[in-house]
Every structure is written in C-alpha cells, then in structure tokens.
Amino acid sequence: MGRQNPSLVIMAEGMGSRFGGLKQIEPADPEGHIIIDFSLFDAWRAGFRDVVFIIKREMEAEFRECFGDRMERYFHVSYVFQELERLPEGISVPAGRAKPWGTGHALACCKGVVTGPFAVINADDYYGRTAVDFLAAQTDESCYADSNEMQA
C-alpha cells in the first residue's frame, strides 16, 4: 500500500484588520492572481490533491466565489471553520474573547477532514516551490517547520 497524498491546509481565517479587508483574496499581480494561486500551483506540481481552507464562517461565500469551480477542477477542496466554541471538552471561552485561538486551534478544527499527512501554509504568504516540494516529499512521521524558504 502506497503513501497517501498529502493535504495542503491553508490558514485563511485572519481578520484582516490591519490590511482593511480580505488580504487572502486580493490580487497580487497585474493579471489578477492572488498569493494562494501561486501556492496552489506549486502544491499541484508537488503532488497535493486535497486542499483545506481554514476560514471564518462569514467568509465562506467569498472564498467559494473566488476558488470554487476554478480550483475544484484540480483539487478536492474543503472548508473548515475556526470557531471559538470548537474546543476540547472541559475548556471554555473566556468572557470577552473575540479573536481566534491561533494555529493549534485552527488545526484542531480540521479533525475529521484531514485524515493523513498534511502541510500547513498561511494564505497570505508565498513559500516557494522548493518548500512545497520538500514538504510533499517527506515520508516519515516527523514534523517540519522551515521559514528559510518563505518569501513575503
């Protein structure tokens, strides 16, 4: 039995408060490509076939409009919602907290959707082909974090 193709998990839940909008879907070049387009192109070449977007529920319509048919021709696309209430049993949201918990919580929200090896990227960063190729080629059970290949 061969190794399962890895999933690409894209953290796109950010509130965009400093940017003033959804930076994740803003064009990054004159042709209208967004940063995620470049990451997905590299991911496809590296063998990723499943993409999971971690988003806010209220962003779903915009993401489906932006990525929907265009990306679903190449990838199996899933959307996961990072919601404050999705916490382990016995943990509760502190009064007044409105911001998401962070990366660990975002990945925990993928439980049941991501069932095999995966790589995680931020929607508004471009990591480059070398980084994506490296992550896709891993065959052991290790975890890797490398910011040396990241290009902002």
Give each language-model segment a name.
Residues I25-D29, M71, L135-T139:
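Glycine-rich, phosphate-binding/catalytic loops in enzymes
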Residues M1-G2, Q151:
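Polar low-complexity intrinsically disordered regions
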Residues Y74-H76, F81-A152:
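Conserved beta-loop-beta/alpha segment of the NTase-like Rossmann-fold superfamily
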Residues G2-G68, V77, G116:
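N-terminal glycine-rich phosphate-binding loop and ensuing alpha1 helix
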